[in-house]
Structure formats: C-alpha cells, structure tokens
Amino acid sequence: MAKESTFNPEHQATHTSSKVVAALERISEAFRVMLWQEAKQYGISPIQVQILTYLLHYPEKLKTVTHLAAHFNMTKATVSDAIKSIAAKGFVKRKEDSEDSRSHSLHLTREGKALARKVERFAEPMEISVQKMGPEKQSGILEQLLYLIQDLNGQLVITPQRMCLNCRFYEKKGKLHYCNLVNAFLKAGDLRVDCPEFRMPAG
C-alpha cells in the first residue's frame, strides 16, 4: 500500500506530523513571496537578496563562495553565477587572498551596502508575527526548530549549520543545554542559529 501524501488534507486530519510539515511548507512559501517582492523592486533575484544580506553581516573569513554555498545549501556554481551578476552591476567586488592568489573573499561596494540595507528588511512581516507570540513561546519554537534542523543535517537534506546543537562546545546535560566555551547553561532562548564562535566537532 502506497504511503499517504503529507499534503493530502484527509491524511493531515488524523496525522499531526503531516500538519506540521504542511504548516512549515506554508511558511517557506511566505519567505519565497517576501523574497520575490523585495527582489523585483531592485531588479535582482531572491538569492541575490540573500547574498547581499549575508555579505553585509558576516566576517571576512566567511565571505567566500564556498561558505555562501554551504550557508544557502546551493552549489558553488549557482552561487558564483549569482555573484557575477551583482558584481557586474557594481554591488560586489572580489578581494584576492594575500597568501593564496587562487582564493578570494567577497565584499560589498558602497552601492552594494546601500542596497543590502534596503533588501535585508524582506523578512520584517515574519519578524512582526513572531514577536506577537511572546518570549516563552518564541524560545520553545526556537528549540524545536533547531532540533528539526539538526535532524535534517543528519539526513543530509541540508548542510550542517553553524548552530549550538552542532558545535563542539555544546553539550546536552539531561534536559539542559550547556556551552563549554562560556562554561554556562543556556536557556532555550539563548541557543543560536548561527554562532560566531561555532566550531565543528573533532573527527
């Protein structure tokens, strides 16, 4: 017997897991809509909106095609094509590595920074909705979403993310979260989706 589709409303009625998946799919649709609406205003693509936003906030060591590809779960070729387009428009420039001429980092030009500060606001409607939930619900949702992301990492659906649960400094002590870098327990709301001190586990 074939497995029922997650997106069959009749199946969803008696399967909470399918309703959760369907709800997450609706949220992903909302992000696609918000990205497209922002991108079309400036004649760029949704991934270019995300790249500009990324380059505005991340440190130089992470401003490479390799890191961008891992962050957005795309091939390096796809990311390179997107960068070539916004570089041609004068929004991004490449900086050669002083120690390795084959390597380079990516930087926003003055025009690129100005555009990035505009387009990075694409998710504001989602932020407003989340803020209405209150701190306790936000923390609970954050914790469960991080567990979901971690499981998808394990299934190789997406690349490992720079979050607490994947970090060598993270430890689960019973039901509590502990960071061995700062030697402190973390509340669910303190967990990070992307931590600047992230280190991959050894081995």
Where are the regions a protein language model picked out?
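Long, low-complexity, charge-rich intrinsically disordered regions
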Residues: 1-4, 171-203
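N-terminal leader segment of winged-helix/HTH proteins
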Residues: 1-42
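Pre-recognition alpha-helix immediately N-terminal to the DNA-recognition helix
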Residues: 19, 23, 30, 50-54, ...
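Short amphipathic alpha-helical boundary/capping segments
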Residues: 34-45, 127-136
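N-terminal helix-turn-helix DNA-binding core of bacterial DNA-binding proteins
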Residues: 36-75
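Canonical helix-turn-helix DNA-binding module
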Residues: 60-104
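Charged, amphipathic alpha-helical coiled-coil/dimerization segments
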Residues: 85-138
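Terminal interaction helix/tail motif
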Residues: 121-168
